[in-house]
Amino acid sequence: MSPRQTVFLIAGIFSIIGIAVSVIIIAIGGGFSGASTSITDPPTDADLWRIGQKINDETELNYSLTIFGSVSSLTGAEVSINFSEGKSDDWKTNFHLINDTIAEDTTILLSKQQLIPKNSVEEEFKQYFRLIENSILSIRDIAREPKYLVIGAPWDTIFVGASSIPVKVIQKENIKTSVGNFDSFIIGYKIGSKTSKIWLTHEVPLPVKAEVYNSEGELWYRYRLIGMKL
């Protein structure tokens, strides 16, 4: 074999090794684990979840919401979120919140990219919008860019004191709701003895359900999708 042929052979071997390594990296998703990923079946763009995906003009999402807190709480509330076309890059979004003692609503412009407010919130609704932001809309904090809905996929890291806690996809589950059954993925993280869980599905632009605990292991808030029009 001539020196020139030897060089081509070595280059070909390294190319094959490089491709194999790339496939392995994709398959484990930079840290993915679990039965749903493999070298022959790596995650693709179809596995990505984007906040606000599938929102259309007149999309409506209805939730039951309860928040437990020493400073602010909300018991047995229903939250209705209605989207309509605003400008090219935002949604004109109506929020309606009601329970036994509250009946409030307001309209806010939310960015289509990340559902971030683009105008000021009316003063009388600020405290209620803060509760919605800290619960139903808090998925924005860990889905700042598209993330994989694949078991083991890392989503974020949260810090409690000196400890760093991974947030990742921990489970796949068929969840039954009043608007139908969904094949969902559970985003989870564990603080102390309690695991906080957020259920996501490709069919719904925001979480379907959540049960989130504080650092003392006490239930902080829970919500569930109870109505939907896409």
PLM features per residue range, with description:
Residues 2-6, 41, 53, 123-130, ...:
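Polar/charged alpha-helical tracts
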